[in-house]
C-alpha cells in the first residue's frame, strides 16, 4: 500500500510539473495575444501598445527566468526524493525477506525442540520400564533366598534326625541286652502280644518310610527347580546388562548431538544479533538536510515499526534460545543423575551376582550332608555287625547258663573257665570298639555343627542377636523376621542339635561306663547274668524318661505284665524302621512348601 501511494503521488507531481512547464514556456506570444485582444478594437490603443511592447517583453523574460529557476530546483528535489523512496523500498523488501527467513528458522527450531522433548519422554518411559523390571528381579531374588534358606533348614532337620537315629541305635543296643534277659522269664502269651505290636510298628514304619521317600523326591525336584530358576535369572541379568550398556551408549550419542545443536544455535543467535546491529546502524544514519515529503515520513515510520517488531521477535528468539539452553542444562544434569543411577544399579547387580554365587554354596553343603549320611550308614552297619556278635555272645552265655552243672570242670581242669574268660574278653573288646566308634562319631558331628554355626554367624549382612539353645525350626516365610532373624534361628537350631546330641550320648556313655553293669573277668556265669539283669534295669530307667508309651490295648497289657516291655518294644520297632530306611529319624515330618511359592501365587 505504501509503495502504491508513493507511486501515485509521484505520478501526480510529474503531471503538475509538466502542465506548469507547458504554461510557462510559450508565455510571451500568449500574453501579447491576450493583451491585443483586450485592447485591440481601436488603432490608437494599438499604437500606444506598440510603444510599450518592448518594455513588456523585457519584463516577461525576466519573470520567466525567475520562475524557471524554482521549477528546476523542485524537479531536482523530486528526483532525489524518488531515488530515496526507491532505496527505501529496496530496504523494505530486504527486511521482509530477512523477516521471512527468521520466521522460517524459528519454526525449524521449534520443530527440533519438539522432537528433542519427544525423545526425552521416550527415554524417561524406557527408564521407568527398566526400573519396574529391576523391582521384579529384586522380588524374585528375595523369594529365591527364602526358598534356599528353607532347604538349608530342612537339611539341618535331616542332620538332626541322623543324630537321633544314632542315639537310638546306642539305646537299642542296651535295650536288646535287657530284652534278652527279660524274655527268658516271660510266658508265651506275651510273645504273641509283642508280635502284634511289632507288626503294627512295622506297618507304621513302612508308611513313614514311604512318606520320607516322597519327601526326599520332592526335595530333589525342588532343588532342581531352584537351580534352573537361578540359571534363568543369571541369563536375564546378563541380557539386561547388555541392554543397559547399549542404552547408555545411545544416551551418550544423543548428548553429543544436543551439544552440537546448542553450539549451532548459539552461532545462529550471534549472527542474528549482528544483523540487528547492522540494521540499527542503518536506521541511525542521518538523513540529508532536504525535508522529506509527508508520504516518505509515513513510510519511514512504518519501516521503524517493522524494524522494532523484528527486533522484538529477535529478542524473543534470543530469550527462547536462553530458555532452551537452560532446559538443555537441566537435561544434562538429569542425564548425569541417570548415569549415576545406572552405575549404582550396575554395582547392585554385581553384588546380586555375588550373592547368587554365595547362594550356590548350600549345594556343596547338601553334598557334604550326603557324604555324612554315607559315613553314618557305614557306622550303622558296623554297629549292626557288633550287635550280631553281641547276640552270639549272649546266646553262648545263655547256653552256658542252661547247662551249668554239665559245664562245671574238675578241680584240676580249667578249659571251660578259660572259654568263658575268652568270651568275656571278646565282649569287653566289642564294647570298647563300640564306644570308640560312638566317640568318633560324636566328635565328628560336633565339629560339623560348630563349623555350620560359625559359618552362619560369620556370614556378611547377618547377625546372631536371637540365637539361643531353644530357638529352632524357623520357617523361611516372607513375613517372619528377616535375613538376620533367619540366620540367627538357623544358628540356634545347630546349637540346640549339638547340645541334644551331646546330652544323649553323654547318658549313653555314662550307662556304658557304669561299673555296676560291667562283669568281673573272673566271675562265674550266674554272677554275669545277674550283672546283666542289673544293667537291664538301668537301661529301663534311662529309657522310660525319653520314650512315650504305646497306644491301645497293648499299652494296658504290657504295663500290667512288665513295665520294661513297653519302651523296649517301641525301640525294637524303631530299629526295624532304621534298618528299612537308615539315616532318618522316627518322627515323620512332611514339610510345607508354601513359603517358596506363595508370593508367586499372589502375583
UniProtKB/Swiss-Prot annotation:
It is a peripheral membrane protein. Residues 69-82 have a biased composition (Polar residues). It is found in: Golgi apparatus, Golgi stack membrane. Residues 46-66 have a biased composition (Low complexity). Residues 82-173, 212-440 form a coiled coil. Residues 491-603 are annotated as: Golgi-targeting domain. GO terms for cellular component: cis-Golgi network; cytosol; Golgi apparatus; Golgi cis cisterna; Golgi cisterna membrane. It holds the Pfam family GM130_C. Its main location: Golgi. Residues 1-82, 95-125, 398-419, 460-492 are annotated as: Disordered. Residues 100-124 have a biased composition (Basic and acidic residues). Extended rod-like protein with coiled-coil domains. Antibodies against GM88 are present in serum from a patient with Sjoegren syndrome. Sera from patients with Sjoegren syndrome often contain antibodies that react with normal components of the Golgi complex. May be involved in maintaining Golgi structure. Belongs to the GOLGA8 family. This is Golgin subfamily A member 8B.
Amino acid at each position: 500500500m505504501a509503495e502504491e501511494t508513493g507511486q501515485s503521488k509521484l505520478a501526480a507531481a510529474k503531471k503538475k510539473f509538466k502542465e506548469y512547464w507547458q504554461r510557462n514556456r510559450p508565455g510571451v506570444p500568449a500574453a501579447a495575444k491576450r493583451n491585443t485582444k483586450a485592447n485591440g478594437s481601436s488603432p490608437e490603443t494599438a499604437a500606444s501598445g506598440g510603444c510599450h511592447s518592448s518594455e513588456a517583453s523585457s519584463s516577461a523574460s525576466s519573470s520567466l527566468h525567475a520562475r524557471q529557476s524554482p521549477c528546476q530546483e523542485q524537479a531536482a528535489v523530486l528526483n532525489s526524493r524518488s531515488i530515496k523512496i526507491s532505496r527505501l523500498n529496496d530496504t523494505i523488501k530486504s527486511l521482509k525477506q530477512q523477516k521471512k527467513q527468521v520466521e522460517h528458522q524459528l519454526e525449524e527450531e521449534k520443530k527440533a525442540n519438539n522432537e528433542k522433548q519427544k525423545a526425552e519422554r521416550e527415554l524417561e518411559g524406557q527408564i521407568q520400564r527398566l526400573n519396574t523390571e529391576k523391582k521384579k528381579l529384586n522380588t524374585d531374588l528375595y523369594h529365591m533366598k527364602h526358598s534356599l534358606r528353607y532347604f538349608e533348614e530342612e537339611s539341618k532337620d535331616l542332620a538332626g534326625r541322623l543324630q537321633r537315629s544314632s542315639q537310638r541305635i546306642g539305646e537299642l543296643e542296651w535295650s536288646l541286652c535287657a530284652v534278652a534277659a527279660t524274655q527268658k522269664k516271660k510266658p508265651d502269651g506275651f510273645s504273641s502280644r509283642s508280635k502284634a505290636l511289632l507288626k503294627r510298628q512295622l506297618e507304621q514304619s513302612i508308611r513313614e518310610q514311604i512318606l520320607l521317600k516322597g519327601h526326599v523326591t520332592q526335595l530333589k525336584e525342588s532343588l532342581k527347580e531352584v537351580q534352573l530358576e537361578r540359571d534363568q535369572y543369571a541369563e536375564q541379568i546378563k541380557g539386561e546388562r547388555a541392554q543397559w550398556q547399549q542404552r547408555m551408549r545411545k544416551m551418550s550419542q544423543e548428548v553429543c548431538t544436543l551439544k552440537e545443536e546448542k553450539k549451532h544455535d548459539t552461532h545462529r543467535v550471534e549472527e542474528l544479533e549482528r544483523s540487528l546491529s547492522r540494521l540499527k546502524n542503518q536506521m541511525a544514519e542521518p538523513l540529508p538536510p532536504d525535508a522529506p515529503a509527508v508520504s516518505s515520513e509515513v513510510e519511514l515510520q512504518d519501516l521503524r515499526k517493522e524494524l522494532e517488531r523484528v527486533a522484538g521477535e529477535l529478542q524473543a528468539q534470543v530469550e527462547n534460545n536462553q530458555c532452551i539452553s537452560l532446559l538443555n542444562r537441566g537435561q544434562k544434569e538429569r542425564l548425569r543423575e541417570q548415569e549415576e543411577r545406572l552405575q549404582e544399579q550396575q554395582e547392585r547387580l554385581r553384588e546380586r551376582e555375588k550373592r547368587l554365587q554365595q547362594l550356590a554354596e548350600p549345594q556343596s553343603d547338601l553334598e557334604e550332608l550326603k557324604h555324612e549320611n554315607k559315613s553314618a550308614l557305614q557306622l550303622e552297619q558296623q554297629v549292626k555287625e557288633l550287635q550280631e556278635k553281641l547276640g552270639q555272645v549272649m546266646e553262648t552265655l545263655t547256653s552256658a547258663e542252661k547247662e551249668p552243672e554239665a559245664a562245671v570242670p574238675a578241680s584240676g581242669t580249667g578249659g571251660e573257665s578259660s572259654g568263658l574268660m575268652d568270651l568275656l574278653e571278646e565282649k569287653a573288646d566289642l564294647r570298647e570298639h563300640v564306644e570308640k566308634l560312638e566317640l568318633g562319631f560324636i566328635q565328628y558331628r560336633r565339629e560339623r555343627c560348630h563349623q555350620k554355626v560359625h559359618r552362619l554367624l560369620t556370614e556378611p549382612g547377618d547377625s546372631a542377636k536371637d540365637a539361643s539353645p531353644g530357638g529352632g525350626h524357623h520357617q523361611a516365610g516372607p513375613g517372619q523376621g528377616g535375613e538376620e532373624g533367619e540366620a540367627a534361628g538357623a544358628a540356634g537350631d545347630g546349637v540346640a542339635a549339638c547340645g541334644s546330641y551331646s546330652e544323649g550320648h553323654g547318658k549313653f556313655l555314662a550307662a556304658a561306663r557304669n561299673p555296676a553293669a560291667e562283669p568281673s573277668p573272673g566271675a562265674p556265669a550266674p554272677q554275669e547274668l545277674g550283672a546283666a539283669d542289673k544293667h537291664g534295669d538301668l537301661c529301663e530307667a534311662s529309657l522310660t524318661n525319653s520314650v512315650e508309651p504305646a497306644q491301645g490295648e497293648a499299652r494296658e497289657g504290657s504295663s500290667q505284665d512288665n513295665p520294661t516291655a513297653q519302651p523296649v518294644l517301641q525301640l525294637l520297632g524303631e530299629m526295624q524302621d532304621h534298618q528299612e530306611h537308615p539315616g532318618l529319624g522316627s518322627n515323620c515330618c512332611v514339610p510345607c512348601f508354601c513359603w517358596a511359592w506363595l508370593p508367586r501365587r499372589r502375583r
